[in-house]
Amino acid sequence: MKDQGIDCLLLGNVGNPILDYIEDIKDNTKLVIECSSYQLEMVHYSPHIGIILNLFEDHLIYHVHLEEYWNSKLNMFKYQNTNDYMLYDSESVNLNNMVNSNNYQSKKIDI
């Protein structure tokens, strides 16, 4: 994105805490944010474009049940509308089943 001249920031679990960059965010700044399942557990906002690559079964230290973990990850799509995009791997059986069992409003794109 930067190579294309787009003002953007890579934030979140990639080592750049969002609050450390809050003053760098302008109206036209595009944000790429990596979030963990426990960060997504109680979100009340969805991104315009959300990407989920996979669901792993190794996050049960924090989450009691596997379905709780998966639902937390999919929370990022909960508030999307028909103008938003969900990118996901439909070849992941668990992820595909979870996506298709919910009534998400966003446009779904298989990656």
Residues of each region from the PLM?
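Generic alpha-helical structural signal
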Residues: 12, 19, 70-74
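Compositionally biased, intrinsically disordered low-complexity regions
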Residues: 14-17, 52
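Conserved phosphate-binding catalytic cores of ATP/NTP-utilizing and phosphoryl-transfer enzymes
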Residues: 17-24
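Flexible active-site lid/hinge loop adjacent to a nucleotide/diphosphate
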Residues: 25-111
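Walker A (P-loop) phosphate-binding motif
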Residues: 1-15
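Active-site catalytic pocket residues across diverse enzymes, especially alpha/beta-hydrolases
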Residues: 1, 5, 22, 102
